[in-house]
């Protein structure tokens, strides 16, 4: 497994110097650590660390999936420099322990979360090394700091899925359908002047992008909500940009190991959206979402509001591998194959997009489930929306 991961990096990573890392030397150190490992979890950790050393948001090791599903029952996000709980699942241990939206997370198992390391927490605790219990230091609005231990819900599943079996196949498809429902696009209208398009992912076909734009073309202002949108397909990004300009747009330059070429979004011409555009982003807006925001901002096509984006814009390809013949174990590697250099000669990787107007919710806003950012955007567009009502439009959805 380590050899396969190393070979993927060696042959496919966009930077032939591997960011100054001696890949062969690091691989030998990893081999020795694997020999001393006492569990599969330790082995996976060694392999993962080899890739984490690249400090590249899109270069990661994905270990074999676990048969047990782990659910922590609470969700957090960084706003500005602070991390807050944004959702707590009903009837979870987190709810029983008194954890609530708006609680500021000071430490997770002794480590202070921040904008730079939060994604690593998710990677370790969800994919690499799930924990049955998480120790939290939290601060509720108007209260003193406290420490709680939150137990995760662990659901044991099947270790082997036979997709030729009807029952197993149906269970697998239901799981995919549940994921799809969490990522539904939604358009909300406010009178004749303002529409909000909640876009959770860049997962639409070109025709679907056009259809969505056609629905909102009549409004004077479109608010495109890309908060918590981690990106997606380049095809979707290019078509979306093409719908907001009357000319072709050179987004930037794709820099690969052996070539460079421009990334161009072709205009949809007179069929696109010609009116006012407001884009909402936050610290979870990544990849295609922040590239879109950057283009809108640099071309002065609209206003970008919210929080600084995540700064995770490298282009990557996922390489799937398997071990075994009759009983197959799958694992994979995401390898960055290109960087995107913007027209100013810089990459958004690590820096992100700073909004034209920084708007951050407070702990009190999150506790009251108010969406002050969306309410401010609607008001700026000439509409009216109470923050409490705004908070009900796109609530956090838990997987069944």
Ranges and model annotations:
Residues 1-18:
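Mature N-terminal segment immediately following signal peptide/propeptide cleavage
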Residues 119-132:
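Short, compositionally biased
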Residues 93, 104-107, 133, 221, ...:
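Residue-level marker of beta-strand positions
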Residues 131-132, 137-326:
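Cleft-lining beta-strand/loop regions that shape enzyme active-site pockets
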Residues 356-397:
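Low-complexity, Gly/Ser/Thr/Pro-rich intrinsically disordered linker/tail segments
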Residues 17-83, 133, 144-187, 385-400:
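Extended, small/polar residue-biased N-terminal targeting/export presequences
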Residues 66-107, 111-115, 204:
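PDZ/PDZ-like domain segments forming the peptide/carboxylate-binding groove
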